[in-house]
Amino acid sequence: MKITLASGSPRRAKILEELGVEFDVVKTDAPEASYPHDPERTVRENALAKGAAAAPRTRVLSADTIVWFGGRIYGKPRDLEDAKEFLRELSGKVHTVFTGVAFDGDVKVARSDVKFRRLSDADIEEYVARVRPTDRAGAYDIDESGDLIVESYTGSYENIMGLPTEPLREWGIA
């Protein structure tokens, strides 16, 4: 089954490619909602909005990922200084990654917990030099030099990357 991925995320495209899913990419400019005390609602509504923005196409897959810690939503950082601040705040702590995934109007939410290593300023500088942190929620990518900052995680690795695979299997996509 061929689908439309309503996302410009290279990590989401990589996951679909690894699963052997045939897809086209459509980038959308849907406005993003933010409910700091309700991360599940945030990702659910954003995933649905991105899918709706790709209409009138059918078989549209869309997703939204956030990092949630201390009652705060960490989306994509504005710039490198913002990214470094995110990493400092998450250093040595456990945070939660939420991804809302929508397919043809149905939406599912995945949750994973991630513990960061204690990061020195040098660790943070090395990480941001290796990874472009400004295009990813929470300023990090577990799949790209994640070993520098991630100590452990529970839940779906693919969810932390931005596209949990369990809903894709439920919908018969993968």
Regions found by a protein language model. Give the residues of each.
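Anionic-ligand binding patches
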Residues: 1-4, 36-174
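N-terminal beta1-alpha1 ligand-phosphate binding loop
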Residues: 1-21
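Short, glycine/serine-rich, charged loops/turns that create anion-binding
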Residues: 10, 30, 102
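Flexible, glycine-rich phosphate/dinucleotide-binding loops
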Residues: 12, 32-34, 169
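A short beta-strand-loop structural module common to alpha/beta enzyme folds
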Residues: 23-32
